[in-house]
């Protein structure tokens, strides 16, 4: 489980179009080059609070709120958790990369006898 607490608010914490800069920490190979900027959107009434410092993030917020006004895409194990919604378009082909990642993890687990 993510080491934090989801808190609901009366008003939206983040809403509208955002721009994300890739940090290079994304666990799905080839999702994007470090520093690449992607358009996306967010709309959420929740925030994630009480996270320990130093957890890696897949994205820095150029515009928008994300998880904390600075970052989005918390990386925890094999998971990328965030509030931003990315479209699968030519400059952000995340669906194919996700499927590749799942297949590689499955192969690794089968090879390890799991």
What function would you assign to each model-found segment?
Residues 1, 40-43, 79-84:
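Short hydrophobic-aromatic micro-motifs
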Residues 4-5, 48, 103-107:
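Generic secondary-structure signature for well-ordered alpha-helical cores
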Residues 7-9, 47-50, 87-91:
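Short, acidic Gly/Pro/Ser/Thr-rich loop/turn segments
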Residues 11-13, 52-55, 92-95:
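Short conserved micro-motifs at the rims of enzyme active sites and ligand-binding pockets
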Residues 22-75:
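Catalytic beta-strand/loop cores that center a nucleophilic Ser/Cys/Thr
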Residues 71-114:
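Acyltransferase
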């Amino acid at each position: 489980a993510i080491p934090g607490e989801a808190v609901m608010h009366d008003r939206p914490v983040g809403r509208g179009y955002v721009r994300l800069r890739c940090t290079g920490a994304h666990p799905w190979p080839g999702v994007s080059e470090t520093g690449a900027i992607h358009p996306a959107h967010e709309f959420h009434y929740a925030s994630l609070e009480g996270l320990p410092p130093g957890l890696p993030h897949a994205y820095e917020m150029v515009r928008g709120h994300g998880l904390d006004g600075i970052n989005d895409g918390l990386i925890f194990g094999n998971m990328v958790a965030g509030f931003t919604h990315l479209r699968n378009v030519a400059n952000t082909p995340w669906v194919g990369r996700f499927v590749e990642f799942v297949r590689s993890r499955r192969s690794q687990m089968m090879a390890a006898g799991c």
